[in-house]
Amino acid sequence: MAQGQSLQDIFLNVLRRERIQVSIYLFNGIKLQGHIESFDQFVIVLKNTISQMVYKHAVSTIVPSKFVSHYANNSSNYSNHSGDRN
């Protein structure tokens, strides 16, 4: 994955661009909800009624409110990494 964008960046960018509501679960069990306003290598800015800067090292899971096809516009960057070992 050295070439182009990382899978993480592609996924977060789709969520940001399409303003998809997300639930972000932190390692300490806290659940944050909103849409991703921006992100960089270290943080995600989540907006709901307020903006919150969340450090990525504290994030356990990001759950979109609807299906996200993060390969749709980036199929040339990645082969199928679905875990199939055929």
Swiss-Prot record:
Purpose of the protein: RNA chaperone that binds small regulatory RNA (sRNAs) and mRNAs to facilitate mRNA translational regulation in response to envelope stress, environmental stress and changes in metabolite concentrations. Also binds with high specificity to tRNAs.
Entry protein name: RNA-binding protein Hfq
Complexes and interactors: Homohexamer.
UniProt keyword annotation of 4Fe-4S present: no
Keyword vocabulary terms for this entry: RNA-binding, Stress response
Native organism: Baumannia cicadellinicola subsp. Homalodisca coagulata
GO cellular component, one term: cytosol
Name of the encoding gene: hfq
Pfam families membership: Hfq (PF17209)
